[in-house]
Regions:
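Non-catalytic accessory regions flanking glycosidase/transglycosidase catalytic cores in CAZymes
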Residues: 1-242, 281-282, 286-506
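Long, well-ordered, tryptophan-enriched scaffold segments
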Residues: 216, 230, 239-258, 263-267, ...
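Beta-strand-rich domain onsets/edges
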Residues: 276-277
Length: 506
């Protein structure tokens, strides 16, 4: 029997709620049809935002939403997306399908969506094709509470009060679609552009996110950190609050992006290969984090994993540029495993945004007209929401088995444990095995307190189990009963291919 030893007297870092963040780009049917249907739609909506989607995201406790991209961000000119919708300029979405973007969802709509969701805002600026002035004026338009050209324009467009920008990305993937820049050049551009991302609110600072590496480009991290810290007072920690990291899990091949593998039809070998590639996130955090430690030992700069998840082939018959893919228990296990990894590294990882929110890549929901279905990944985020803002507890797995074989071998069980402000302990676990359940003895080292299970939920299913509009509850969150309270904690039996959440109360 595997054991999880929990030192519930050793509270470590706080798990930032933003680790459970999401990403919405003008790509495929993420914004249009997914989130936004317009005020005149027959689909129930509030100010154009789908009611069913907003309600489900609030239930999931979405903490932060990133917009407008992605690669789209570095060709997006924000002034095209304000004012009367019938007068907004159209553009070609060159990155994603070559479709016409009518800009009916712009700045006002994004902040209205976040208001309805009750979540923080992460705006990604255009460094690749935009100007310093354009970026500066966007921040002024959004946040300045006074008399100025941009504030006056915002008021003319119907919003008297300013909004709050919680996070601002100064460019996106500038090593690639955001300008194909060298790290030193981007870092110099970052230093210049971020200067004009001004804090107009005073008591509400904007957290500035610097474009970090693609996957394992450790040289990018070194050179960007070195350039940003050069001739910079230590108290400004490189003029950044976060450094982004992008990593997608490709199921079938990592050499040819044209052969990523099916989202629903795969072998057991590909299943374990996918999980092992998802597990690579741990190494990426450790190695990029070690470089960041050289410049920022106090961890003032968060590692911001603002694009992650499984990227598979699109569903047959759909636009290849729309990145619409199904979502199975394989996705759920990668999500649960990855979120547990983020929790364990919450001293450095301060935000993460799975790609993407709806109808694109590893989304939490899919829509078709007025129909909406929750994916297995949705339920993982819903079950693990209790970690948001809680204190990470020191925990370790002892005697755990492995699954897969050869280069695809990885731990059978992943876990993380936290305690919230009310003293409730949350334990989240994944069983990555397709063949066997796993008995786990969760032992709390503080013998003075007696805990018992107050809530237990789980999802399970075949590796390719997924929800459709015709069968929306093939994978569904249910009460978990395979546990026994003990003198030191709780013993559980994790079903094969499952994600489990336990809540322990005194």
């Amino acid at each position: 029997m595997a054991k999880i030893i929990v030192n519930n007297e050793n509270k470590k870092s706080t798990i930032a709620p933003e680790i459970y963040g999401h990403f919405s780009e003008h790509l495929g049917r993420c914004i249009y049809e997914g989130l936004f249907v317009g005020e005149n739609s027959d689909i129930p909506n509030v100010n154009g935002m789908r009611t069913d989607v907003v309600d489900a995201l609030k239930e999931m406790k979405i903490p932060v939403l990133r917009w407008p991209g992605g690669c789209f961000a570095d060709e997006y000119h924000w002034m095209d997306g304000i004012g009367p919708k019938e007068k907004r300029k159209k553009m070609i979405n060159t990155h994603w399908g070559g479709v016409v973007e009518d800009n009916s969802f712009g700045t006002h709509e994004f902040f209205e969506l976040c208001r309805q969701l009750g979540c923080k805002t992460y705006v990604n600026g255009n460094l690749g094709s935009g100007t310093v002035r354009e970026m500066s004026e966007w921040v002024e338009y959004i946040t300045f509470n006074g008399v100025s050209p941009m504030a006056d324009l915002r008021k003319e467009n119907g919003h008297e009060e300013p909004w709050t920008i919680d996070y601002f990305g100064v460019g996106n993937e500038n090593w690639g679609c955001g300008g194909n820049m060298r790290p030193e050049h981007y870092a110099d551009e970052y230093r210049r552009y971020q200067t004009y991302v001004r804090n107009y609110a005073g008591n509400q600072p904007i957290n500035k996110i610097c474009c970090g590496p693609n996957v394992d480009d450790y040289e990018w991290t070194k050179k960007v950190m070195a350039t940003c810290f050069d001739h910079c007072e230590p108290r400004f920690h490189g003029q950044m609050d976060g450094l982004s990291l992008h990593y997608y899990t490709l199921p079938e091949t990592e050499e040819d992006w044209n052969i990523k593998g099916s989202a629903t039809k795969f072998t057991e070998d590909i299943f374990y290969q996918t999980l092992k590639r998802g597990y690579f996130m741990e190494e990426l955090i450790n190695r990029h984090g070690a470089i960041m430690d050289e410049y920022d030992p106090d961890k003032n700069i968060g590692l911001i994993v603002d694009e992650w998840g499984i990227w598979s082939d699109v569903e047959p018959g759909t636009n290849p540029g729309f990145l619409y893919q199904q979502n199975t228990m394989r996705d759920a296990l990668v999500a649960g495993m990855t979120l547990n990894i983020f929790n364990k590294h919450s001293d450095r990882v301060k935000m993460a945004c799975i790609a993407q929110l709806i109808n694109v890549l590893q989304s939490v929901m899919l829509t078709d007209g007025d129909k909406m279905v929750k994916t297995p990944t949705y339920y993982v985020f819903h079950m693990m929401r209790h970690h948001q803002g809680a204190a990470l507890l020191d925990s370790s797995l002892v005697g755990g088995a492995t699954v897969g074989s050869g280069k695809n071998e990885l731990p059978k069980v992943f876990e993380s444990v936290s305690e919230d402000k009310d003293g409730v302990i949350t334990v989240t676990l994944t069983n990555n095995s397709l063949e066997s359940s796993e008995d786990v003895d969760i032992m709390l080292t503080n013998e003075g307190d007696k805990y018992s299970v107050s809530e237990a939920r789980y999802i399970e299913g075949a590796m390719d189990a997924h929800n459709t509009f015709e069968a929306p509850e093939v994978v569904d969150e249910k009460d978990f009963t395979a546990y026994e309270n003990t003198q030191t904690g709780v013993k559980v039996t994790l079903p094969a291919c499952s994600v489990v959440t336990l809540r322990l109360s005194k």
